[in-house]
Amino acid sequence: MIAASGPTPLVATTQRTLAGTAQWSGVGLHSGQWVALTLQPAAANTGRQFVRLDLEGQPVIPARIEAVKSTQLATELVANGASVRTVEHLLAALAIAGIDNVTIQITGPEVPVLDGSAQPWLEGIQRVGVVPQEAPRPAVILKEPVTIYEGEAFVSAIPAPELRLTYGIDFPYRAIGRQWCSFTPSELATEVAPARTFGFAEQVDYLRSQGLIQGGSLENALVCSASGWVNPPLRFADEPVRHKLLDLWGDLALLGTPPIAHYVAYRASHHLHTQLARAIAQQRV
């Protein structure tokens, strides 16, 4: 359990950080590079930030929407001449745990994929514990609805009395098809964090030829083919859509504290997720 008591972490009234240090290592999904990653407590109002230990000067990359550069099959941040990729699962876990301030030390260009979900991150955070800080967490109100479209795909944020995430997908694979899910913050740790990333067997060779999924394997991603799942069992019957919702929450975490709203997405992508986050950030100006 998370050590700090009181309100649900996502709606806590004060900022939070880690009670200690947590460490992981693993391969990057796209780079295939082995990387070590350490979470360190950070002072109030620091925010979430990456530090590239392997680069001269150890440049800092804020986990903020302003730092987003690329969203091709993952979210990449760039700042101070450095980059870090595939940040969404870790950021989702930090947001689920209610961690506002943390220094993320990393020895390479991509966050390890681990098992393809946010569960290993969340379990490590829970082992260390989370502590409240004296600084208040800002209450962020969505002023008006925001919707971003791209063909049939869309993502929306609608003012609401409580935070809720709803996601829909539709793939021409019998094993997936059309799926919808909807969760509140208190359900994310158990119902969404364990959902793993997924891909399609027919695309593997092409993506690898493009320099992508170099670290992908049947141990860190679900793979779907025309005849069904290559590496069952699934953790949930609708695991793919739950993972897409996890990606959305990780991308919205780039706002720091996302506004209380009902977020609805259909056939969306990291590009649409981050476009929504940018539009919400503009409301704050």
Curated annotation (Swiss-Prot):
Reaction catalysed by this enzyme: a UDP-3-O-[(3R)-3-hydroxyacyl]-N-acetyl-alpha-D-glucosamine + H2O = a UDP-3-O-[(3R)-3-hydroxyacyl]-alpha-D-glucosamine + acetate
UniProt-listed Pfam families: LpxC
Swiss-Prot/TrEMBL keywords: Hydrolase, Lipid A biosynthesis, Lipid biosynthesis, Lipid metabolism, Metal-binding, Zinc
EC number: 3.5.1.108
GO molecular function: metal ion binding; UDP-3-O-acyl-N-acetylglucosamine deacetylase activity
Enzyme class per UniProt: hydrolase
Endpoints of the signal sequence: none
GO BP field: lipid A biosynthetic process
Catalytic residues (positions): 270
Cofactor(s) in the UniProt record: Zn(2+)
Pathway: Glycolipid biosynthesis; lipid IV(A) biosynthesis; lipid IV(A) from (3R)-3-hydroxytetradecanoyl-[acyl-carrier-protein] and UDP-N-acetyl-alpha-D-glucosamine: step 2/6
Sites where the protein binds Zn(2+): 89, 243, 247
One GO cellular component, as annotated: membrane
Domain of life, source organism: Bacteria
SUPFAM superfamilies: Ribosomal protein S5 domain 2-like (SSF54211)
Similarity remark: Belongs to the LpxC family.
Protein's job: Catalyzes the hydrolysis of UDP-3-O-myristoyl-N-acetylglucosamine to form UDP-3-O-myristoylglucosamine and acetate, the committed step in lipid A biosynthesis.
Protein name (database record): UDP-3-O-acyl-N-acetylglucosamine deacetylase
Organism listed in the record: Thermosynechococcus vestitus (strain NIES-2133 / IAM M-273 / BP-1)
